[in-house]
From Swiss-Prot:
This is Uncharacterized protein F22B7.3. Pfam families: DUF5390.
Amino acid sequence: MAHNNYLDLEMLFNECNAQHYENLGMFFKWLQQFAAHHEDPKITIKDFKGDKTSGEMILHVNTFTLFKYRQEFDMKVSALNDNGLGWKILFVDRSLGCN
């Protein structure tokens, strides 16, 4: 992955209907599967709360699946500014709006 330095190695990932939080490895697996089965993603920031040291945003994802229908979902991303060295993603919550 090209931007590993933006992800905290101890980050947590919450997938749809998961029984417990997953780790960075499972996030990479989900992201690779998502990229392989979807195309033309349009990602917009729906809501942002934060300052120069920490922040949380809701990303709205609208994409085509391989079967050519649009899929839309929201996901929450929480990040922390690592002592001025840059932003690190600490938590990705994909469970928003899941059935």
